[in-house]
Amino acid sequence: MVVRRRPVQTTKSRLPWHFWVVGPFYVLLYGAGAYDYVMTRGHDPAYFESQGYDDAQIAYFTDYPLVPDVFWTVAVWGALCAAVLLLFRSRWVIPVVLIALIFQVCLDVVTFAFMERWQILGTRLALFDAGVLRLTVGLLFYCRAMSARDALR
């Protein structure tokens, strides 16, 4: 008679409590960014009015060139996908958030250096963009820390 034993699990990868704060926070943050993207790309006049955009700001988004549009699209949807992947504890979250971060940096470089983003949209939105960029860097470091704890599969 052969007795088969189940392997004993010596280490259990428990999730820290902050995982359930950080994950939903980023889903909400990037979900709001996706909503902004859809409303802005759809040229919704009511949305522009609710944001307090003037004619120059509306024209800025209405005549958006292809290259920054690609950067913006990948940055927004990549970041949202990364936040969802984090909640699913997927190991793919790290490359996805890294891609989103790279495209976000490219978008900021192009729009601030060549499209007069600061002058047209103002200080408030420029600081907001910088804050989102910092939060995305934070997400990358957080995901790497969760990977080091074997919290990602």
Question: How would you label these PLM feature ranges?
Answer:
Residues V2-R153:
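Topology signature of small-to-medium multi-pass alpha-helical membrane proteins
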